[in-house]
Amino acid sequence: MKRITIISLLTIAVMALSATSCKVQKKASETSSTTGIVVPSTPNQDPTAPVVYFTSDISPEGLVKIYEALGVKPFGRVAVKISTGESEESNHLRPDFIKNLVNTVNGTLVECNTAYGGNRATTELHRKAIAERGFEKVATVDIMDSEGDMQIPVVDSKHIKYDIVGAHLQNYDFMINLAHFKGHTMGGFGGVLKNQSIGVASSRGKLYIHSAGRTTSRWLDDDQDGFLESMAAAAQAVHNYFKQEGKDII
């Protein structure tokens, strides 16, 4: 049975990378002194709490170092979940910045189409945008809902009954959630959780989350609290999907 690993990275002035494995925590203390990566120590810290890695080396090489500090080896088909950005001026992670990491893990860049119009609303338009931004020069790019979507179970939600994700998600054994931090007019902040929920959702799934479970066919955004709760539930659903498949999440 395949294992699926998700690693979440966050970029904001420093790079932060969290993992929940005690084994990884031990590895972090062994590697931080040689890589320049700082792992803050907290008195009486819960041994099961995530470890957060920080580095001031905001470069392609620094991104690889903070990934390697985990001591986790990729396997099988590796998906690197990014945001391709709505325009050249948006704050998405640039291809040159992520290239070394993607090549290190032999990854496929993955995304899903948007649900609000714009230049990523269809697979054809999205492919054009991906080419214009230069992502295809880094690696193969898979639009995961280009051939439809699938439902995965949701547990802790009073709004959505399931999460609708790109069908190609099931094709990967190992996923890196590579997110950038930003202010977001609806979500408050965009980052790892948004990239794992809205980002992995298909176009229909995005409408379902934004409408707090009311529709998959039109844009509704009048229930802000319901949307935020649905987004959190969708992120949890992706996590639980991997766990229930008998795989793994790191």
Predicted segments, located by residue:
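Low-complexity, intrinsically disordered segments with a bias for serine/threonine
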Residues: 12, 33-37
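Residues in and immediately flanking transmembrane alpha helices
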Residues: 15-16, 94
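Ser/Thr/Pro-rich low-complexity tandem-repeat tracts
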Residues: 29-33, 41
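Hydrophobic alpha-helical targeting segments used for export or membrane insertion
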Residues: 9-15
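Extended, low-polarity segments enriched in aliphatic/aromatic residues
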Residues: 36, 43-104, 108-250
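C-terminal motif of bacterial Sec signal peptides marking the signal peptidase cleavage site
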Residues: 18-21
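Bacterial signal peptide processing site
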Residues: 23-25
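Bacterial N-terminal signal peptides that target proteins for export
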Residues: 1-8
